[in-house]
């Protein structure tokens, strides 16, 4: 089954931030483009079998069906809806960040 992949405003902002950090802070625009391409390719691959990646292990996110897609040093956090055939990308972040804290901030917004 083919799913529609929707990127939230926050996830879009996350992707822009990743690009800007690598391109401008690390002064590596080529690497920034490559990393963004890898992330986008993996995100778009969620149109098929989005349940193939592990569920996030902590509540309340586990009950909501949140899943984790690792992409090199980053994680894509998303929720697949099998009834509507939609995958919603919630966040894209560096894997070394405090994911719980970032999800809590996302919930409060």
List the predicted regions and their residue ranges.
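Basic/aromatic recognition patch in beta-strand/loop cores that engages polyanionic ligands
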Residues: 49-83
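Enriched for short, Lys/Arg-rich terminal
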Residues: 71-75, 79-109
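Basic, Lys/Arg-enriched alpha-helical interface segments
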Residues: 1-62, 108-109
């Amino acid at each position: 089954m083919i799913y529609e992949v929707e990127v939230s405003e926050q996830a879009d902002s996350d992707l822009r931030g990743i690009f800007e950090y690598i391109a401008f802070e690390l002064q590596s625009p080529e690497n920034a483009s490559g990393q963004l391409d890898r992330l986008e390719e993996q995100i778009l691959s969620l149109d098929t079998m989005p349940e193939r990646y592990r569920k996030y292990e902590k509540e309340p996110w586990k009950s909501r069906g949140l899943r984790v897609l690792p992409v090199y040093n980053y994680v894509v956090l998303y929720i697949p809806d099998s009834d509507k055939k939609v995958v919603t990308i919630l966040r894209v972040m560096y894997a070394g960040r405090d994911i719980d804290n970032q999800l809590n901030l996302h919930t409060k917004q």
